[in-house]
């Protein structure tokens, strides 16, 4: 960018983009982490603020209950979200959804239907497989990624007799299927970094939007007034057509014709009503053409002089008069300005809003270590020297005549098992 042209510092977003799409980044001495939100909910909150500028954050949260991630999942901790919306900082847990399925053979299957935001599915699957190999998660027989265009689906087939809820807790505890997301709502406000709460985000958006809509309205007003000014000139020339033709035919050059048209005072009987719709100056039945109007008259095509062409000019002037009146109303009234912003937001919501994907719940996340251990029958052995050992029954089997069993326990020298107990 060589600064030879003007470059916009911001884009005229019609909805709170920063909240809807979220943002994350690190700069020198500062960082930001803003989660994405549901478009429809953010617009509802913005409309509520337009209706009541003194609305509290707790009331805004009736419209915006929390972040909404494109990957779905479940947010845990409503109080943490409330803290983030009030102070701009906080950290909440988000977990993927795992459902249970029972197969025809009676075995259980866990299905991961959604994963936390910014978690890589392939990395997650590899991590689960690694934990199975390391026997940190027991009871998993097979893992398959069955995801397609319709959504995420990772099938985890369990071994017979394994408790699905225990495996589910192990997955939450040891993998990224349950992750943390940090609130740090730092944004650039008026050129300076500032940590904003939920209401401040929406207030800053409305302030920005008011400025954009006001500039746009003024631009449209100038454009409409310029067009109406030219049409009035054409209307005056049509009313005085014979005189206009006489001046043009009697001029040696186009410049002479231009000067003569500019210096002539024109009668406006039929055009007076048209003039009064657009211009407020007192004409007293006479009208002076401007340079722009004269240039438009000299470039006028003959087909505009037909009855149809004259009628088109009158119709367009009336439409422009109504448009100019409504634009001036918006510029002079903040209430009308906010009404325009409100209508734009409603149109966007109707066209693009989608249902919420992320659920929000309250839950206790401090897992008891016993909840992550599979329930199974174990063998307790007591030795002569007082050693006690716990082992799985899978390590032993009943030995039949002439058969060979498994070594269930080994003992030290001169020690032996004196008692066994299956529990």
Language model feature labels by segment:
Residues 11, 23-24, 30-423:
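C-terminal interaction appendages of subunits in large macromolecular complexes
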Residues 1-15, 409-410:
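Conserved mixed alpha/beta core segments that line enzyme active sites in large multi-domain catalysts
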Residues 18:
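Flexible glycine/proline-rich, aromatic-decorated loop/lid segments
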């Amino acid at each position: 960018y060589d600064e030879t042209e003007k470059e916009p510092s911001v884009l005229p977003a019609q909805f709170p983009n920063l909240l809807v799409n979220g943002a994350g980044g690190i700069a020198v001495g500062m960082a930001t982490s803003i989660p994405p939100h549901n478009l429809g909910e953010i617009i509802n909150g913005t409309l509520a603020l337009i209706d009541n500028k003194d609305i509290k954050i707790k009331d805004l949260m009736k419209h915006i209950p929390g972040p909404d991630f494109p990957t779905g999942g479940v947010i845990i901790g409503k109080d943490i979200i409330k803290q983030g919306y009030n102070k701009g900082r906080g950290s909440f847990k988000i977990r993927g959804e795992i459902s249970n399925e029972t197969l025809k053979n009676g075995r259980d299957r866990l299905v991961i239907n959604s994963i936390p935001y910014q978690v890589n599915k392939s990395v997650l699957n590899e991590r689960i497989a690694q934990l199975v190999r390391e026997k940190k998660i027991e009871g998993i027989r097979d893992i398959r990624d069955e995801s397609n265009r319709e959504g995420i689906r990772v099938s985890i087939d369990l071994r017979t007799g394994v408790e699905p809820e225990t495996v589910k807790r192990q997955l939450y505890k040891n993998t990224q299927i349950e992750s943390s997301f940090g609130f740090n709502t730092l944004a650039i406000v008026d050129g300076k970094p500032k940590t904003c709460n939920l209401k401040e985000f929406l207030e800053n958006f409305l302030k920005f939007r008011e400025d954009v809509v006001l500039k746009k309205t003024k631009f449209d007003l100038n454009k409409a007034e310029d067009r109406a000014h030219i049409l009035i000139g054409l209307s005056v020339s049509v009313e005085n057509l014979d005189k206009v033709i006489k001046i043009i035919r009697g001029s040696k050059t186009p410049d002479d014709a231009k000067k003569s048209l500019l210096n002539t005072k024109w009668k406006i009987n039929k055009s007076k009503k048209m003039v009064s719709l657009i211009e407020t100056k007192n004409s007293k039945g006479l009208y002076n053409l401007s340079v722009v109007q004269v240039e438009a008259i000299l470039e006028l095509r003959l087909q505009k002089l037909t009855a149809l062409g004259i009628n088109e000019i009158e119709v367009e002037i009336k439409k422009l008069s109504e448009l100019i009146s409504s634009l001036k109303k918006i510029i002079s009234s903040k209430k009308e300005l906010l009404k325009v912003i409100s209508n734009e937001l409603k149109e966007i919501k109707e066209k693009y809003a989608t249902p919420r994907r992320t659920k929000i719940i309250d839950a206790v996340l401090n897992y008891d270590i016993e909840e992550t251990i599979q329930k199974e029958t174990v063998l307790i052995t007591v030795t002569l020297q007082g050693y006690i050992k716990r082992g799985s029954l899978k390590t032993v089997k009943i030995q039949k005549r002439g058969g060979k069993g498994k070594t269930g326990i080994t003992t030290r020298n001169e020690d032996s098992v004196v008692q066994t107990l299956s529990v």
